[in-house]
Amino acid sequence: MTLGLINANPVVQAKKEGLVRREDQYRDDGVDPLEIYDYVRDIRDPEHPYTLEQLRVVSEESVTVDDKLDRILITFTPTIQHCSMANIIGLCLRAKLKECLQLHYKVDIRVSPGSHADEVSVNKQLNDKERVVAALENPNLRQLVDECIYSDEI
């Protein structure tokens, strides 16, 4: 047993090799859910050496894009209900999308309904601009977020 891990034995899925685009219903300058999923699926979990895709924290179905309103919604599912890393995972998702997307998109990041004991609190924190900026200005949190986002590049 590994000491210090909240979920010492997560369920790990096989990594998908390639993503197949569905019928293109999005305008030329817009994004589609598969593109967004492709941006975030390789983010490493802050607690385990696996990606969010491998742990099924994010999936293709968890991304919604409304190009007419320029809104993106990502719901993620922590591996356990009392996951202490849910806020970090949300910060990683937000930081990665901020890096990859045009500024005009409104991004909402939420934990899947019923998947976390502090769902309301986590959702509120992840979608409060001031809290997100403050968290990402913290050098220790920023380093952890960067390690998760760029783990395959380090």
From Swiss-Prot:
Gene3D superfamilies assigned to the protein according to its UniProt record, in alphabetical order: 6.10.250.1280, Fe-S cluster assembly (FSCA) (3.30.300.130)
Leader peptide range in chain numbering: none
Domain of life: Eukaryota
InterPro entries associated with the record: FSCA_dom_sf, MIP18, MIP18-like
GO biological process: protein maturation
Summary of the function given for this chain in its UniProt record: May play a role in chromosome segregation through establishment of sister chromatid cohesion. Unable to complement ae7 mutants, and thus probably not involved in the cytosolic iron-sulfur assembly (CIA) pathway.
Family: Belongs to the MIP18 family.
UniProt protein name: Protein AE7-like 1
Protein's organism: Arabidopsis thaliana (Mouse-ear cress)
